[in-house]
Amino acid sequence: LNSSPTGDVSGERQTTSLFVELNAPITDSISTQLAVRHESSDDFASATVGKFAIGWEVNPSLSLRASASTAFRAPNIIQLNEGGVVRSGSNDDWVVQRVQDVLNEAGGYDGDTSITDSDIDSYYTIQRRAIGGNKLDAEESTNSSIGLVYTPEMVPGLMVTLDQWSIEKEKTIGLFGRENQIVNDMLLRFENGLNNCGSFIGDPLVVREAPDAGEAGYYTAAGICPIGVVKYVQNDYTNMATRNLAGTDIGVYYDIDTKFGDFGFKYIGSKTDEFTQDASGEFAFLQSQKEAGLIPANIPLDGFGDLLGMDGNYDTKHTVKASWRLGDWGATMSMLQKGEFYQNSLTLSDGTRYVIPEMTTIDATVSYSFRMNGNKARLRFAVKNLEDERAPLADRYYGYYADAHQDYGRNYYLDLRVTF
């Protein structure tokens, strides 16, 4: 209770913007588009972005398209004006975890050959405190894409799209993270050893309680000054490193009308080929320390490096939908598949990853349209997650990775919609 209080936030923003768009045909088969937008706000720097797009109708069946653009995202009202927000969550105390590992590698402590959380607890509730920052800059991105649209004349109703895209985003707004801050605290404490224990505080953003006298011996035996549990980690919003994403999207759309009804088919597939965040500043320092072997392999670094396939960032997503309509009746069936990824915090000391497998769900609906007191009405019955697929097991709240999956199981709803 009251472990994650959120205070009221107030703020205001006055924005002046200007937008200009020009569509300029070059030939009968080639057209271009040029757009420019400028925004000026009173609480962060102004920004000017633009877009250039070109399309070429090679023949009645094939069109090529490409675009390049810049974009920005202003810091939101909360990120600029947050007076203070606290979030509590269970986290690893990597200082304690490493102390356990060091003692166990040395044969234990005080006659105990296996030091665990029952001796000194390495996993408990830790608060994160954050405040807004009026020094935040807007996120900026450069985007490009190239693709094609294919509508074969010999198959009426069929359309295939294929696009390759890339995004480079700078000044991404985010948090350094509790985990990373505690890892930095661990580095500083093991580097300091047993020197000046009365005055040494480690990472000043990791605020700890006074050491427990009954546990002090574990830390001195491992070669560091005794510590208490983490009271809170100060983690304010900041503009972080450059983020790069790239991938390929494909779409297949097919509609056909028959005496048995109108049928539709849609497939959308997305393959992410790159998702990285450059290590800079504190991130770069931690990465260099890990590469030097000063941070063990079983201690994860969050939020930078190669993020593809990590912690909910699956690299494939497939959506399939089939629909039918005849008169007042209609039906649909759809499938959603999300690819596998690994949970970084469960990586073993030898580098073995815990892989969370892909998840596929199927939905189905039946609908009937009619008139109700002269108004258009529709009654729909739907079954979500037809096969009662459960979310794959993960070391998270409720046993699954909520950032990527839902675990509702099979569920139903009946919907009546009336248009007046």
Model regions: which residues?
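Outer-membrane beta-barrel transmembrane domain signature of Gram-negative proteins
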Residues: L1-S31, A279-N313, K317-T319
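Surface-exposed extracellular loop regions of Gram-negative outer-membrane beta-barrel proteins
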Residues: V9-E57, S141-S145, S334-L336
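Outer-membrane beta-barrel signature, preferentially recognizing the C-terminal barrel domain
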Residues: G11, A74-V160, V233-G247, T258, ...
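Hydrophobic, lipid-facing positions within transmembrane beta-strands of outer-membrane proteins
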Residues: T16-L22, T48-I54, G132, T142-L148, ...
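Transmembrane beta-strands of outer-membrane beta-barrel proteins
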Residues: T32-L34, G50, L64-A66, I146, ...
